[in-house]
């Protein structure tokens, strides 16, 4: 667990990301649509796409997303990629599970292209609405 205390439990809200190698005309469009759609008691799931062309060490989660999701009642976030802003997320008490930290955000590195779709993290299929329980 990168931030928060105790057990994280909620219903999966997986997104799909793709690696990009230049800045889009309008960044974060897919991310913002997903952020609008995620709801109370859901877990925002972001697979790193590391086995499908994702080779950037960019953080998939940080303080701004944590703040927005905490105020929406989202249960937490789960990624098999890096996260950033860990001190600020810990201060918020928002539960985030990730594998490492990175100061880089996803702009010009990844784009969220779909949300509330099936995902795979470390060989585990995660479908929208699956119950996720995480603890350290």
Question: Each predicted region: which residue ranges?
Answer:
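A hydrophobic, small-residue-rich beta->alpha segment in the mid-to-C-terminal subdomain
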Residues: 131-136
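Feature captures the catalytic cores and cofactor-binding loops of soluble hydro-lyases/lyases
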Residues: 1-128
């Amino acid at each position: 667990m990168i931030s928060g205390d105790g057990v994280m439990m909620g219903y999966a809200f997986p997104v799909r990301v793709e690696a990009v190698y230049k800045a889009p005309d309008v960044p974060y469009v897919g991310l913002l649509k997903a952020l609008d759609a995620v709801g109370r008691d859901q877990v925002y799931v972001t697979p790193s796409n590391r086995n499908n062309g994702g080779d950037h060490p960019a953080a998939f989660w940080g303080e701004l997303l944590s703040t927005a999701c905490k105020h929406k009642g989202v249960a937490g976030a789960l990624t098999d990629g890096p996260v950033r802003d860990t001190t600020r997320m810990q201060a918020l008490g928002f539960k985030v599970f990730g594998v490492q930290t990175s100061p880089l955000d996803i702009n010009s590195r990844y784009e969220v292209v779909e949300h509330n779709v099936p995902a795979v993290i470390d060989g585990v299929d995660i479908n929208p609405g699956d119950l996720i329980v995480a603890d350290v």
